[in-house]
Amino acid sequence: SNLEFLGFPGIYIDDEFTQGIEIQQVLTPQVRSQALKVVHDMFAFDVDSDAEEDMPVSEIKIQKTIERIVENILSNGDIMCNVLDIKNYDDYIYYHSINVAMMSVLLGANYGMNEESLYQLTTAAILHDIGKRFLDIGIINADHALTEEETQLLRKHPELGADYLKGNYHFSTLVYAGVMQHHENYDGTGYPL
């Protein structure tokens, strides 16, 4: 926590085991900052307010952020992914969303996805937990085992997120499916379906 107080998200250990490993940032500080702001604003707006500052983030702003993330990562070539950005628990959801987006671009590019598919994948990745904004913060940040009722509420976040996005944005069906199904497993287990 002293490092965090001083503004350092983490440190690298330089010893005989790390010789020859070059650590590169996956995103530039500017792109990371923009992405965090967009994700924060997506979670922070007031659903019941008509005030302009409480309106959802514009689709254009989200798309520009996604483009910058994808282009920033693709321009770095082969990089060793550094995902040290899980800060404190209160900010976890924002950093988690960015980390999932970064990993999605890296995996999608590795599998040979075209740029348009990477944009859709990254949009779904960065917004995958948006449904959590409709849940009680006590459930999201619980420091105890959730009750059965709390677990059932938490398991609704993919559907809440997909419904919210469908009602407020014009993303592709693949983006909505990615948000809706991000806790589904190949064997049919998982949720919400």
Features from the language model and the residues they span:
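His/Asp/Glu-rich acidic catalytic environments and adjacent acidic regulatory segments
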Residues: 1-14
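Acidic loop->beta-strand submotif enriched in PP2C/PPM serine/threonine phosphatases
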Residues: 191-193
